[in-house]
């Protein structure tokens, strides 16, 4: 029988493969500590029961069924004769007593071993359970924090979306209000052009002001809602970043638990559905990115429109200021030309008066008239050739020493009086300068007619200054050239013959009007000389006043030029602001792209970790 058993297919099989505890033993490496304790306890009970059964059979001298052994192998015996008594029959009692003792010893030994093994397993199981519970509590806490952060980020994203929609609607309302303002402005302009009555114009103007007020309120609401949307968008971004940090903490805790408790820990512990919120967080962040991108685009469009409108307005103002500047410059040039013409006319009148006075002085003042004519012609020639008027240089000391201090004193008194009356400082100074020049001229004219001693002193100073300047002029190259020109002009034009003829004609004219006495001629000559002096002073005063007016116009032109430069700077500043807005938009998009790239890398790392765990897992 034994040979038959050995000769069958089971003879070539491994005893471990057919052992009843094979499955339990193979599962020891993958079971939890509690299951491991249960398996070992069952194996010990099975072993003790089997040992008790074998011991009782041997004590009763009864062979076990099928000669069964603990390892299910057949019991082999030496061949015996049929009639021969079994060996060792006399010491059956002793053998039975030895088997019982062996069973008792084995039982005690197994009891001790089992007790120590169970205690150790229980201790390890308790430690394992405590560590597992702590890890589970930590993971649960992190999972709850992650879930809360995800919910808050989602709620903030929804609030930001609603705020963005409200800001968009407010922007549309503001555009509609601007269109209403443009329509009201057009109706008002058309009414002004058509010349409608004042009551209709007032009604249209009131409607225009109301539309402007509504447009201002609409723009204020739009700006407030846009600021609120931006604030909520920033809050949503911060919450999304916080949720991402919580997710990273959860991933780190899971990786640490996997390394500490083995690769099969994730298989033994069911995965909490709260930890699978990466997809939800990705969706929330994607939605948040869409909102941020949309908000950045709208903000860029709004800034671009605002800067474009501001640039258009500044360009219109710049064009207007430029036109005003050109007009002021042209006005100043025309004023300067006009005053120059007036000065020339008065100069020729003075020359004519000098020639008229020659008739009553017997030709004595004709030389002065000729000199005046020569100076006038020479001044025009010098101005045309060199661009410099020597008459202006001659009169400059008079202006600096006499007229300017007098005009400044009178102007200061007038300015102080106007300021004391409540007039603006700048306007008072301008009016004082003009009135000072006029009052100075009037005073000199009045003094010339009255013949006061002060005028004589002034006249003496004027004559001394002019004599000195005239001497310097005649010694200079210009004076020498002027003398040569006058001589040539006299020779070519017959000025000497003209002078003699003029003297003869003047003598006849003097006799015709009844001026026979020398005293009468001198009296008329003095009167003509006074008239010439008065006209000369009036000419200088008018020229000074004209210079002041021209200076005022030039000052206005310079102010307009400053406004033009300021407008050009504003346009450049608006261009720089628009460039900064574009750079900020590009930076926001770059940050969002980097955030999404980090999320993608985190998802890829999580997938790789899952694949590694699955490869290292063993089937139970």
From Swiss-Prot:
<keyword id="KW-0472">Membrane</keyword>
<keyword id="KW-0964">Secreted</keyword>
<dbReference type="GO" id="GO:0005576">
    <property type="term" value="C:extracellular region"/>
</dbReference>
<dbReference type="InterPro" id="IPR003895">
    <property type="entry name" value="T3SS_SctE/BipB"/>
</dbReference>
<keyword id="KW-0843">Virulence</keyword>
<keyword id="KW-0812">Transmembrane</keyword>
<feature type="transmembrane region" description="Helical">
    <location>
        <begin position="401"/>
        <end position="421"/>
    </location>
</feature>
<keyword id="KW-1043">Host membrane</keyword>
<comment type="function">
    <text>Plays a role in the bacterium-induced formation of multinucleated giant cell (MNGC), which is formed after host cell fusion, as well as in the intercellular spreading of bacteria and in the induction of apoptosis in macrophages. May act in concert with other effector proteins to induce fusion of host cell membranes.</text>
</comment>
<keyword id="KW-0175">Coiled coil</keyword>
<dbReference type="GO" id="GO:0033644">
    <property type="term" value="C:host cell membrane"/>
</dbReference>
<feature type="compositionally biased region" description="Basic and acidic residues">
    <location>
        <begin position="66"/>
        <end position="84"/>
    </location>
</feature>
<dbReference type="GO" id="GO:0016020">
    <property type="term" value="C:membrane"/>
</dbReference>
<feature type="region of interest" description="Disordered">
    <location>
        <begin position="58"/>
        <end position="95"/>
    </location>
</feature>
<feature type="transmembrane region" description="Helical">
    <location>
        <begin position="355"/>
        <end position="375"/>
    </location>
</feature>
<feature type="coiled-coil region">
    <location>
        <begin position="309"/>
        <end position="339"/>
    </location>
</feature>
<comment type="similarity">
    <text>Belongs to the SctE/SipB/YopB family.</text>
</comment>
<keyword id="KW-1133">Transmembrane helix</keyword>
<protein>
    <recommendedName>
        <fullName>Translocator protein BipB</fullName>
    </recommendedName>
</protein>
<dbReference type="Pfam" id="PF16535">
    <property type="entry name" value="T3SSipB"/>
</dbReference>
<dbReference type="InterPro" id="IPR006972">
    <property type="entry name" value="BipB-like_C"/>
</dbReference>
<feature type="transmembrane region" description="Helical">
    <location>
        <begin position="430"/>
        <end position="450"/>
    </location>
</feature>
<dbReference type="Pfam" id="PF04888">
    <property type="entry name" value="SseC"/>
</dbReference>
<dbReference type="InterPro" id="IPR032391">
    <property type="entry name" value="IpaB/BipB/SctE_N"/>
</dbReference>
């Amino acid at each position: 029988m034994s040979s038959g058993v050995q000769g069958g297919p089971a003879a070539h099989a491994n005893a471990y493969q057919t052992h009843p505890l094979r499955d339990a033993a193979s599962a020891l490496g993958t079971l939890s500590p509690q299951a491991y304790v249960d398996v070992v306890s069952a194996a010990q009970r099975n072993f003790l029961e089997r040992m008790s059964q074998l011991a009782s059979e041997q004590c009763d001298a009864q062979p076990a069924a099928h000669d069964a052994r603990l390892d299910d192998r057949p019991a082999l015996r030496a061949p015996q004769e049929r009639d021969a008594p079994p060996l060792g029959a006399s010491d059956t009692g002793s053998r039975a007593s030895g088997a019982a003792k062996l069973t008792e010893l084995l039982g005690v030994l197994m009891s001790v071993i089992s007790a120590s093994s169970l205690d150790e397993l229980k201790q390890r199981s308790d430690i394992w359970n405590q560590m597992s519970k702590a890890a589970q509590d930590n993971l649960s806490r992190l999972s709850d924090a992650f879930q809360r952060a995800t919910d808050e980020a989602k709620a903030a994203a929804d609030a930001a979306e609603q705020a963005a929609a409200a800001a968009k609607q407010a922007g549309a309302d503001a555009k509609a209000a601007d269109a209403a303002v443009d329509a009201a402005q057009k109706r008002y302009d058309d009414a002004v052009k058509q010349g409608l009555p004042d009551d209709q114009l007032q009604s249209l103007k009131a409607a225009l002001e109301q539309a402007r007020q509504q447009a201002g309120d609409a723009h204020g609401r739009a700006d407030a809602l846009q600021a609120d949307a931006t604030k909520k968008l920033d809050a949503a971004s911060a919450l999304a970043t916080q949720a991402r940090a919580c997710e990273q903490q959860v991933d780190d805790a899971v990786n640490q638990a996997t390394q500490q408790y083995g690769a099969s820990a994730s298989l033994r512990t069911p995965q909490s559905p709260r930890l699978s919120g990466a997809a939800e967080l990705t969706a929330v962040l994607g939605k948040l990115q869409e909102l941020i991108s949309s908000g950045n685009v709208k903000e860029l469009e709004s800034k671009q429109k605002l800067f474009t409108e501001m640039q258009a307005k500044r360009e219109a103002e710049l064009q207007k200021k430029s036109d005003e500047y050109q007009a002021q410059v042209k006005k100043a040039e025309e004023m300067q030309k006009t005053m120059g013409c007036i000065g020339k006319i008065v100069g020729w009148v003075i020359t004519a008066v000098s020639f008229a006075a020659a008739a009553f002085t017997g030709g004595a003042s004709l030389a002065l008239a000729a000199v005046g004519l020569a100076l006038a012609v020479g001044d025009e020639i010098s101005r045309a050739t060199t661009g410099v008027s020597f008459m202006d240089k001659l009169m400059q000391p008079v202006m600096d020493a006499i007229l300017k201090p007098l005009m400044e004193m009178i102007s200061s008194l007038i300015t102080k009086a106007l300021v004391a009356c409540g007039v603006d400082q700048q306007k008072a100074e301008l009016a004082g300068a003009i009135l000072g020049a006029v009052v100075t001229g009037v005073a000199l004219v009045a003094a010339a007619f009255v013949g006061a001693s002060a005028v004589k002193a002034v006249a003496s100073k004027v004559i001394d200054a002019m004599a000195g300047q005239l001497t310097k002029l005649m010694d200079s190259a210009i004076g020498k050239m002027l003398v040569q020109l006058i001589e040539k002009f006299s020779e070519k034009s017959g000025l000497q013959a003209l002078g003699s003829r003029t003297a003869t004609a003047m003598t006849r004219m003097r006799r015709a009007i009844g001026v026979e006495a020398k005293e009468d001629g001198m009296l008329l000559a003095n009167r003509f000389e006074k008239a010439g002096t008065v006209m000369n002073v009036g000419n200088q005063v008018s020229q000074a006043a004209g210079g002041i007016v021209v200076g005022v116009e030039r000052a206005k032109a310079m102010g307009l030029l400053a406004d033009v430069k300021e407008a050009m700077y504003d346009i450049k500043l608006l261009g720089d602001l628009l460039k900064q807005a574009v750079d900020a938009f590009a930076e926001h998009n770059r940050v969002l792209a980097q955030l999404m790239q980090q999320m993608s890398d985190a998802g890829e790392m999580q997938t790789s970790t899952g694949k590694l765990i699955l490869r290292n897992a063993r089937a139970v």
